[in-house]
Amino acid sequence: MDIAIHHPWIRRPFFPFHSPSRLFDQFFGEHLLESDLFPTSTSLSPFYLRPPSFLRAPSWIDTGLSEMRLEKDRFSVNLDVKHFSPEELKVKVLGDVIEVHGKHEERQDEHGFISREFHRKYRIPADVDPLTITSSLSSDGVLTVNGPRKQAPGPERTIPITREEKPAVTAAPKK
């Protein structure tokens, strides 16, 4: 069976996801559906996305969601980490990169035993000081990592020139 492979750097002009702000299909450690194991047709999409990612139950839609925003005054990353406790998460700044790591060892759930682990890296914009990056975890399991953007210089202004009557350089007395 032949499966067409489309390279992500080949863009079609009317494809709606030219530069998505969200990473698609991030179901960290979620169990597979039977339909995930069968090949699918790529005739409708130039990129491969698991079809069940948009057909799953509504409660699964935001699982593993990662969203990066660059607003006027701040840079932020929101990451759905509801399957991890705060002790199982680490956020580090390495140079101009934020690294988020989550891991929990094998434990039992309603389907059997499961362990999860993920790594995410985000480049810090040049106008955000890495020393100002903070993170917080909401009660519904969304990790937010953010930092303020440096303020742009004010608008251009013309400085008036005033004329003085005395010279700036005076001659030194002759010896």
Swiss-Prot record:
The modification N-acetylmethionine is found at residue 1. Gene3D superfamilies: 2.60.40.790. It comes from the Eukaryota. Keywords: Acetylation, Chaperone, Cytoplasm, Eye lens protein, Glycoprotein, Lysosome, Metal-binding, Methylation, Nucleus, Phosphoprotein, Secreted, Zinc. Its main location: cytoplasm. SUPFAM superfamilies: HSP20-like chaperones. Lens as well as other tissues. Zn(2+) 1 binds at residues 83, 111, 119. Residues 56-164 form the sHSP domain. One of its GO terms (molecular function) is protein-containing complex binding. Belongs to the small heat shock protein (HSP20) family. Heteromer composed of three CRYAA and one CRYAB subunits. Aggregates with homologous proteins, including the small heat shock protein HSPB1, to form large heteromeric complexes. Inter-subunit bridging via zinc ions enhances stability, which is crucial as there is no protein turn over in the lens. Interacts with HSPBAP1 and TTN/titin. Interacts with TMEM109; in the cellular response to DNA damage. Interacts with DES; binds rapidly during early stages of DES filament assembly and a reduced binding seen in the later stages. This is Alpha-crystallin B chain. The gene is CRYAB.
